[in-house]
Amino acid sequence: MNTPAQLSLPLYLPDDETFASFWPGDNSSLLAALQNVLRQEHSGYIYLWAREGAGRSHLLHAACAELSQRGDAVGYVPLDKRTWFVPEVLDGMEHLSLVCIDNIECIAGDELWEMAIFDLYNRILESGKTRLLITGDRPPRQLNLGLPDLASRLDWGQIYKLQPLSDEDKLQALQLRARLRGFELPEDVGRFLLKRLDREMRTLFMTLDQLDRASITAQRKLTIPFVKEILKL
């Protein structure tokens, strides 16, 4: 695990969730937009939505990693873990190079948090320098926010839906993750996993990591019989 150059919260980000490890599928235009915002020297805003497990957090982690490697100060705020901190943690974030707010749907109906996000958004607009990336599980207008002005602000910028991966893309994503971890996932084994397991990517990646560890321990290559043995299928 690694820590970006600056985090406003005591959190660690996964060092394997980068743009290089993200299989885009039908999301090439989204990736291009994200990287364009990160390259520019002035502020930019993107709202990204998708169901849980589609890769929203991966992309925010990747954005933080890219800018922190350049020495820029970044902030990552996972609102699904907001019980760990208070809204005042957002104070001063308009001075960072990048602010990533994850899972904004989690604060719907929470007056203090909605106002804190709204105020931060306005400060970032005034600063003109901070890049802002926000994710949710639905479009801004469908978030059931209690503060109409916040819903309006979130609807201003570029809005993208993270498209789900096809089965072929999921296979490619699994093989990419395997290569980055230093081993090969045979195509027949990958297709077997897609056929027999929950196809949610987080589950597939966790299973792949489990198989990697088992393969190292047993000093065996990944084959369908070995996978059946380890996963008790």
UniProtKB/Swiss-Prot annotation:
Record note on what altering L233F does: No growth at 30 degrees Celsius, impaired RIDA
GO CC terms, sorted: cytosol; Hda-beta clamp complex; membrane; plasma membrane; replication inhibiting complex
Superkingdom of this protein's organism: Bacteria
Region (Beta clamp binding motif): 6-11
Cell location: Cell inner membrane
Keywords associated with the record: Cell inner membrane, Cell membrane, DNA replication, DNA replication inhibitor, Membrane, Nucleotide-binding
UniProt main location, coarse: membrane
Function: Mediates the interactions of DNA replication initiator protein DnaA with DNA polymerase subunit beta sliding clamp (dnaN). Stimulates hydrolysis of ATP-DnaA to ADP-DnaA, rendering DnaA inactive for reinitiation, a process called regulatory inhibition of DnaA or RIDA. ADP-binding activates Hda to hydrolyze DnaA-ATP; Hda monomers bind to ADP with about 200-fold greater affinity than for ATP. RIDA function can be genetically separated from viability, suggesting this protein has another function as well. Suppresses the toxic effect of overexpressing a TrfA N-terminal 163 residue fragment. Inhibits inner membrane-associated plasmid IncP-alpha RK2 replication probably by interacting with plasmid-encoded TrfA.
Note: Starts with a CTG codon.
Family in the record: Belongs to the DnaA family. HdA subfamily.
NCBIfam families in the cross-refs: DnaA_homol_Hda (TIGR03420), PRK08084.1 (NF005982)
Protein name: DnaA regulatory inactivator Hda
Organism of provenance: Escherichia coli (strain K12)
